[in-house]
C-alpha cells in the first residue's frame, strides 16, 4: 500500500499534498484505486485528486 493513500486515510496528508505526490510520481492513480478497493479512501476523494470519476 502506498504511503500517500494511508496518509490520506489517516488525515496525515491533504488531497492537495497527494496531488503534488502524483505530480512528482511518488503516488499514482492506480495506488488511489487500490485504496478505494481496500476502503481506505472514497471515490469522491479520488475524483477530487485526479479530476476523474472512477
UniProtKB/Swiss-Prot annotation:
* Pfam families in UniProt: Phage_XkdX (PF09693)
Q: Which family does it belong to?
A: To B.subtilis XkdX.
Q: Which organism is it from?
A: Bacillus subtilis (strain 168)
Stored InterPro entries: XkdX (IPR010022)
Q: Which domain of life is it from?
A: Bacteria
NCBIfam families membership: phage_XkdX (TIGR01669)
The protein's name in its UniProt record = Uncharacterized protein YqcE
Amino acid at each position: 500500500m502506498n504511503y500517500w493513500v494511508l496518509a490520506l486515510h489517516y488525515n496525515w496528508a491533504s488531497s492537495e499534498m497527494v496531488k503534488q505526490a502524483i505530480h512528482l510520481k511518488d503516488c499514482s492513480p492506480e495506488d488511489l484505486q487500490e485504496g478505494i478497493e481496500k476502503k481506505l479512501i472514497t471515490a469522491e476523494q479520488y475524483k477530487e485528486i485526479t479530476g476523474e470519476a472512477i
